């Protein structure tokens, strides 16, 4: 059986710095606790993270017949993706660069029986 079951969301149009703030809050928590935390946080980054977490739990349930209630978030991280470079009008007719960052979000879960 797999040690960890993971799910990845790539090219999410959000800064990795903002996503990591949320991931730090759910790392090491149970699946149920992580969902509750994400549900009540007032940040936009919680939506894609919640989708990835639910996908990882579905992978564990479907592929390895693990119980969702017995899952723990073992790994959660966000890497930087490609940066979209845009320009905004600046002073004196100049153009100022704007870097629209993207993220790759990875969440891995494991069964609590494996953690102990």
From Swiss-Prot:
SUPFAM superfamilies registered for this protein in UniProt: Ribosomal protein L22
InterPro entries: Ribosomal_uL22, Ribosomal_uL22_bac/chlpt-type, Ribosomal_uL22_bac/org-type, Ribosomal_uL22_sf
CDD domains, per database record: Ribosomal_L22
A single GO molecular function term of this UniProt record: rRNA binding
GO terms for cellular component: cytosolic large ribosomal subunit
Keywords: Ribonucleoprotein, Ribosomal protein, RNA-binding, rRNA-binding
TM region positions: none
Gene Ontology BP annotations: translation
Family: Belongs to the universal ribosomal protein uL22 family.
Self-association and partners: Part of the 50S ribosomal subunit.
NCBIfam families reported in the protein's UniProt record: rplV_bact
Function: This protein binds specifically to 23S rRNA; its binding is stimulated by other ribosomal proteins, e.g. L4, L17, and L20. It is important during the early stages of 50S assembly. It makes multiple contacts with different domains of the 23S rRNA in the assembled 50S subunit and ribosome. The globular domain of the protein is located near the polypeptide exit tunnel on the outside of the subunit, while an extended beta-hairpin is found that lines the wall of the exit tunnel in the center of the 70S ribosome.
Protein name, as recorded: Large ribosomal subunit protein uL22
Encoding gene (name): rplV
């Amino acid at each position: 059986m797999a040690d960890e079951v993971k799910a990845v969301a790539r090219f999410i149009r959000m800064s990795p710095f903002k996503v990591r703030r949320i991931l730090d809050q759910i790392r090491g928590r149970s699946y149920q606790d992580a969902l509750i935390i994400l549900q009540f946080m007032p940040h936009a980054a919680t939506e894609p993270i919640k989708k990835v977490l639910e996908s990882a739990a579905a992978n564990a349930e479907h592929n390895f017949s693990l119980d969702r209630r017995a899952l723990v978030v073992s790994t959660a991280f966000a890497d930087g993706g490609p940066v979209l470079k845009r320009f905004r009008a600046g002073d004196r007719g100049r153009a100022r660069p704007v870097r629209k960052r993207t993220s790759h979000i990875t969440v891995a879960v494991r069964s609590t029986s494996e953690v102990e």
